[in-house]
Amino acid sequence: MSDEIDVRVSLDLDPEAAMGTIRDYDDDTASYVSGAKTAFAEAFTSLRAIHDAKAAVAEDPTLNEAGQLLKVDDFAQRRMIAKVYPLWDTASANLNKNVVAWEKEMTKEVVSKASQMVSGEIRAHMKGLKTGERMAAISQAIRDGDEVVASAVLGAPAMLSGLDDEMKGILLREYHERFNPGLAKRLRAVTAARDLIDGRMSVLKKEVTKAVGTIKIKGSSFEIHGQYSGEITPRQLREKRDKSNKPFAV
């Protein structure tokens, strides 16, 4: 997490805390998800800046509460549109490209490690087993690191071993996870990072709204119960301002 804990901003957007939720995030995968970390860092920094701007504008004697709110909202929108949202969109898109590409790698065909005759005998043996026994035998070969048996089955059309395409796809993924663990780890990391970016966009937008704030309308019994009857948002203020400016249009 950031050295300085800022309670004004949700911990869900802290870059270190966010990356810490990715199980496979370490030195091996950090470079592949760096775009996500950068996006979170910029969001966190920008939200702190919005809170700071709100505190500073409150000291401006030339602006009333409505003017202060609009000034903060203008600053927030410029910052988010110019810096934060583009970073999040780019991070999500780039991570998704890797997910798509590596998902294909995880189910690509393999080359048989055995001779044609041995491969044929292995496939014939597997085809003679019952479906459950067949899947179990191939999975066991993969877990045992027996590339000869596994590749003999998966390096040929599925029907030759008594499999269908769906079964073969499942086994191919299992094969690549066993024999290419680095790729499997990277895929898990970028998938988690993409889902994190996409899933926390709603948190980001809520935090922007919270940082900018609204004008609270005091209820008739505010002095007694401390209750507000409503609020005025920056959008509502802008609409009223623009409407009042129409008579001055040239």
Segments the model singles out, each with a brief description of its role:
Residues 3-38, 69-172:
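Long, charge-patterned amphipathic interaction tracts in eukaryotic proteins
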Residues 2-45, 52, 132, 182-189, ...:
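Polar/charged low-complexity regulatory segments
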Residues 40-57, 91, 98, 102:
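Non-transmembrane amphipathic alpha-helical segments
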Residues 116-250:
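A long, low-hydrophobicity, low-complexity, charged/polar interaction segment common
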Residues 59-63:
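Charged, low-complexity interaction regions
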